[in-house]
């Protein structure tokens, strides 16, 4: 009997457990997914129609402007112009730097050649003409045509030097002589521009000889200029105009007539003539008085 009661109680417990689990599942199913009858009653469906916009065709439409250029053409054009400007600035900077470098090298070669020429003589051109540097050899070939008297007596020749022409005036000649002949010891400009400490003792002697020769040539040119100017003065090219000559003659006649009238008036005036004819009473000197006394006694 005991076993039967236990079996009945266990089966009752199992049934109650199954019933409780079925209730839980049912409630969960109802909460998670509503039934079709409840969904149809609670929700209502609404439909909306969205229109599709289609733009008109560009082909053959005069009221719509279209460009056949690709997108970004304006930015490409502006960028190319700006880049071209920057390229021009860079090229100008490079060209100016190259030109200044060439001028600096040319000045350096000129200074070296002049110093060497002043120490050695005229044979340096033939020795240096076969140099491997084309720029220096070309410069030296140009320098061969310059007179030797220019750089023999100069330790530091200036690049802006020019030979004085014989047709210069006295002032220009003096200034050119002041630039041409200078002493490496006394001249302040040469002392400031010196590039070596070498002082040639023969500079002064050569300068004096050259100065005397140039002064002699200048004297000859000045004398020739004076003789030519005298010939031009004797034969003037332009004569005075006839109207000026007539005015000058009339002026001379009027001045001469006035002078004659004044002289006549002075000679005819009785008061002035009487005053002039009457001698002035002056005191006699002692010597004249003694001479007259001795004459009366004799």
From Swiss-Prot:
**PANTHER family for this protein:** CHITIN SYNTHASE 3 COMPLEX PROTEIN CSI2-RELATED
What protein family is recorded? Belongs to the PRM5 family.
> Keywords, A to Z?
Membrane, Transmembrane, Transmembrane helix, Vacuole
Chain segments annotated as transmembrane: 75-95
Q: How does it sit in the membrane?
A: Single-pass membrane protein
Where in or outside the cell is it found? Answer: Vacuole membrane
InterPro entries reported in the protein's UniProt record:
PRM (IPR051009)
Lipid metabolism among keywords: no
User: What is this protein's record name?
Assistant: Vacuolar membrane protein KLTH0G09570g
Main localization (coarse): membrane
What is any one of the record's Gene Ontology cellular component terms? vacuolar membrane
Q: Does the keyword Transmembrane helix apply?
A: yes
Q: Where is the composition biased (Basic and acidic residues)?
A: 274-284
Q: Where is this region: Disordered?
A: 123-146, 226-298
């Amino acid at each position: 009997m005991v076993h039967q009661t236990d079996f009945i109680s266990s089966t009752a417990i199992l049934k109650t457990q199954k019933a409780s689990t079925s209730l839980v599942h049912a409630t969960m199913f109802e909460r998670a997914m509503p039934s079709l009858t409840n969904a149809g009653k609670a929700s209502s469906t609404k439909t909306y129609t969205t229109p599709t916009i289609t733009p008109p065709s560009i082909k053959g439409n005069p009221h719509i402007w279209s460009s056949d250029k690709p997108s970004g053409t304006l930015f490409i054009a502006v960028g190319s112009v700006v880049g071209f400007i920057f390229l021009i600035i860079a090229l100008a900077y490079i060209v100016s730097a190259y030109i200044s470098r060439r001028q600096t090298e040319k000045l350096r070669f000129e200074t070296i050649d002049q110093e060497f020429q002043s120490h050695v003589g005229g044979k340096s051109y033939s020795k240096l003409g076969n140099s491997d540097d084309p720029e220096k050899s070309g410069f030296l070939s140009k320098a061969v045509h310059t007179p030797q008297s220019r750089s023999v007596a100069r330790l530091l020749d200036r690049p802006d030097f020019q030979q004085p022409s014989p047709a210069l005036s006295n002032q220009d000649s003096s200034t050119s002589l002041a630039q041409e002949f200078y002493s490496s010891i006394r001249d302040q400009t040469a002392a400031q521009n010196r590039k070596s400490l070498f002082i040639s003792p023969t500079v002064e002697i050569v300068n004096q000889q050259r100065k005397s020769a140039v002064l002699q040539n200048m004297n000859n040119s000045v004398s020739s200029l004076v003789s030519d100017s005298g010939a031009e003065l004797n034969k003037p090219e332009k004569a005075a105009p006839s109207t000026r000559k007539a005015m000058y003659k009339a002026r001379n006649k009027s001045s001469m007539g006035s002078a004659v009238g004044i002289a006549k008036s002075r000679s005819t005036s009785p008061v002035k003539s009487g005053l002039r004819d009457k001698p002035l009473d002056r005191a006699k000197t002692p010597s004249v008085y003694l001479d007259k006394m001795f004459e009366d006694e004799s």
